[in-house]
Structure formats: C-alpha cells, structure tokens
Amino acid sequence: LNTVLHILFVIMSVVFIYPILLTLAISFTDEATLANYGYSIWPQKWSLDGYRFALSGNGIVNAYKVTIAASVCGTLLSVFIMLLYAYPLSRKDFKHRTGFTFYAYFTTLFSGGLVPWYIVCTKMLHLNNTFWALFVPSLVGSFNILILRTFIKGTIPFEIIESAKIDGSSEFGIFFKMIIPLSKAGIATIGLFQLLGYWNDYYLPMMLITNKNLFNLQYYLQSIFLDMEALTSGQYGSAAMASAVNIPKETT
C-alpha cells in the first residue's frame, strides 16, 4: 500500500511540477526557435532576451519592492485585526458574540456592490494612488475571522482564560500573552492565505492605482504584456512596429 501511495504522489508531483518547469524553460528559449519548433521542456536555443526586456529599466525592481512591502504590511495588519475580532467571538462570557458572528457571516452572503465599494475607497478613505490602497481594502475577511474563531474555540480551553483572569491578568494581557502564542498554527494558516492573496493581487491596483511607481508585480507584468500587444498590433504606427520586431513576446 505504501508503494502505491508513493507512486501516486510521485505522479501527482510530476503533474504539478511539469508546467512550472515548462514555463521556466520557455523563458530561456530563443523567440524565433519557439515560433518555429514550439514549446519544449529543454530549449533548442538558449536566450536571455526575455529577462533583458523585463529587467530593462527600474520598473520590475520597483514593482517587487512595492509588492513585498504591501504583502508584508497587509498580512501583519490583517492577521492582527482579524484575530482581535475573532478572539471575543470565541469567548463564552461575551454575550454579544452571536450578533457579531452573524454580522461577520452576513457579509459573506451579500456584497455592498462595486460602486459603493469604490466610492468608500476613493471619496471617504481617499485611497486612490496611495500605497495603502494595495492592502487596506482587503484587510478583513469574514471567512478568515470565522476560521480563527473556530480554531481558538477548539484549541484553547476557556478554563485557561478564566484561570488567567483569576490570577489578575488583564484582557489585553490574556490576548497577547496567551491567545496569540497558543494560536500560532491558526495565525500561520490565515497569514499564508493573506500573503498569497496580496502577492497575487491584481484587482486593487487595477481599480485604485494609476501611478506607475505604485504598480505591484502582477499589475506591472500585465502592463508589460498590454504594451507588447499594442506594439505588435500596430496601434502606434510604423516606427513603433519596427521597434516591436525584436520584442520577445512569448518568452517574457
């Protein structure tokens, strides 16, 4: 049985790893060779033109800096805020926990809509073209709050909290000295969800950012592809078409 499971996991690993290796191989393949012979896991002719084009200028470096900063700040803030909300919901002695739980759950069923969301972000919070726009609108997720609440309720006995209160610990003392250290597994899980979400986010910069210095990595790469599409489609005239001939469109 173990042998069968090992073989199954090896096959699944190959299935998941192969597209990554193929993408990496394509990035090192010469553009003309790719057009003539198609995709291959081993390049017939190696080339770094795609990397040279992507790294030309400081745009990609700045996009990495913005993405890393937004991902780290957003993850730390969102996990802390959601933990502050989730912890009271797990307490038996918090009489309003049912109402606050329903309030969090209700937002998963109905959305306020795109237009009200945009008005709040731009007219009330003034987030447009600011660094905060890359993570503040996504700081709190109701689903993550419910996960944290369930984790705390299921892993930390309420008797421990009562013992700490009897010993004279304050609510913030219990939260920082007991709840956070004992919830590391749940925090790590939600933190990973948030980190991946911020790193791969394309929606927020598309809606709120027009300043190229604030483009994150995903939106910057998309802007590169759109520029290449525009050049190769001839939208900018014959001079631009001439300069677009050598653009490594497929390998970038």
What are these regions (language model features)?
Residues 1-252:
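A hydrophobic, multi-pass inner-membrane permease signature
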